[in-house]
Structures are given as structure tokens and as C-alpha cells.
Regions:
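Transition-metal
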Residues: 1-91, 151-179, 203
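A generic beta-sheet turn/junction motif
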Residues: 43-45, 78, 132, 199, ...
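Conserved metal-binding segment of the jelly-roll/cupin
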Residues: 50-53, 113-132, 139-141, 226-227
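Short beta-strand His + acidic residue motifs that chelate non-heme Fe in jelly-roll/DSBH
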Residues: 59-61, 127-132, 137-140, 206, ...
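Intrinsically disordered, low-complexity linker/loop segments enriched in Gly/Pro
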Residues: 76-116, 121
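C-terminal amphipathic alpha-helical segment
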Residues: 147-222
Length: 227
């Protein structure tokens, strides 16, 4: 409701109003009345909490509307910036709960030193956390469901620890271990390079140094350009 069109024939209207009148603008694959993506720019001055999002099936079992799959694209980072993505060793749900309890859960997570242009795809169920010193674009399925696993024992202004969702997260986590969670890709001058493709979004990166045409109008859904 707070996003207002600034030019063209819809100038002055909210995005919600425009989409209510013209749901076809979102294409044929979107649920009517629901903008399908959240796109955030996150500038982390300190480490954010370790968390996980359930997939659609797990979310419904847990009483949520839908799950959340997302991705990160690093825009900038400090020299010592790090993040967590996925498990680096096999653990069971009971071991996970014990590691949350004793504060050692980070020992089970794959930690990455990151730099500009790094990409991480985060399917629902993958444990993750953004460390301090990261400025990134987060593209995600529209959903508010987040299960906080660990918050480094920080307290709020009232001296209370933030709520953790240990049991819900145990049900949502994908305990599969992979060798590498960073997306490997090679930029190509003035051409699209696909860096993520899932049921909820497809993301490509362009490395542009000359005029380039992007055929957005030929697609069967909307296109968001981040420059």
C-alpha cells in the first residue's frame, strides 16, 4: 500500500491498487491478489540470527500458509564479512537441539568468507545466517514464516532473550549435507547468466559495459531489474 507509482498512466496509484485492477500484469503463474516475491536490500552491521524457513508442505503441517525459498546476491562486503549456509556435517534432529541448547550450533554450519558478486541459493529447509559486513540483495518467496534457531545469546532492551523456535525448526530443517553451498557461475559480458531457477523465481545477472537489450516484455510474468 505504501508503494506509489510515480509516472505513466497509473501515476499516483498504489502498487496494490494497480495489481487489483490488472492482475494480468503479474503473469499467469501468480496467485491472484498476492505479489509473489519479496525483494530486500540487507546491510548487516552485525550478525543476524541463525534461522530456517520451512518448505510449503512443512509450513502447512506447522499451521503456516506457505514456506519460503530465497537467494542472496552480494552487492558489497567488508574484507572480513562472512555468512552461514547449510550444514557442514551430518547431525540428527536431537543433536541439533542439543547444539542449540549448549550454544555450539555454529560448529555444524558451513561458514563462508564472502565477496562482491557471490551468490547463495537457499531452498526452504536450509539453515542460514548473514554475518556482519554484508550488503546483499535477498530475493524470496512471499512469506513471513521464519524459525529463529540461535541469536548468539543477545538480549533486547528489556534484558530478555529473543524467542527461539527450536521445535518448529527441527521439523523444517533439511539435514542433507552438500560439499559446497555457494553458487558457481561465470559472468559473461553483455549477456544474461542464470544464477538461480526455482518454482518461485528465476534470476539472471548481467555484466554490462555497452548498450544491451533485455527482452522483458516477451516473458509470461513480470520482470524486476536491479541496477
Amino acid at each position: 500500500d505504501n508503494n506509489i507509482v510515480t509516472n505513466g498512466k497509473f501515476s499516483g496509484m498504489s502498487i496494490d491498487s494497480v495489481l487489483s485492477e490488472h492482475p494480468e500484469f503479474l503473469g499467469t503463474e501468480c496467485e491472484k491478489g498476492r505479489f509473489p516475491l519479496l525483494i530486500k536490500f540487507i546491510d548487516s552491521k552485525e550478525s543476524l540470527s541463525i534461522q530456517v524457513h520451512p518448505d510449503d508442505d512443512a509450513a502447512r503441517i506447522l499451521g503456516e500458509e506457505c514456506g519460503k525459498t530465497e537467494m542472496w546476491y552480494l552487492m558489497q562486503s567488508d574484507a572480513d564479512a562472512k555468512l552461514y549456509s547449510g550444514l557442514k556435517k551430518q547431525i540428527t534432529p536431537d543433536e541439533y537441539k542439543a547444539m542449540v541448547e549448549d550454544g555450539s550450533i555454529c560448529d555444524a554450519l558451513a561458514q563462508y568468507s564472502v565477496k562482491e558478486d557471490d551468490v547463495f541459493f537457499l531452498p526452504a529447509g536450509r539453515i542460514h545466517a548473514i554475518g556482519a559486513g554484508c550488503f546483499l540483495t535477498e530475493i524470496q518467496q512471499t512469506s513471513d514464516v521464519t524459525y529463529r534457531i540461535y541469536d548468539f545469546k543477545r538480549k533486547d532492551n528489556d534484558g530478555s532473550y529473543r524467542e527461539l523456535h527450536t521445535e518448529e525448526a527441527a521439523e523444517a530443517i533439511d539435514y542433507t549435507v552438500f560439499d559446497d553451498y555457494r553458487t558457481q557461475y561465470t559472468p559473461c559480458k553483455n549477456q544474461a547468466v542464470e544464477i538461480a531457477d526455482c518454482s518461485y523465481f528465476t534470476t539472471s545477472v548481467y555484466d554490462i559495459d555497452s548498450p544491451t537489450n533485455i527482452e522483458a516484455v516477451k516473458k509470461d510474468t513480470f520482470v524486476v531489474l536491479i541496477i
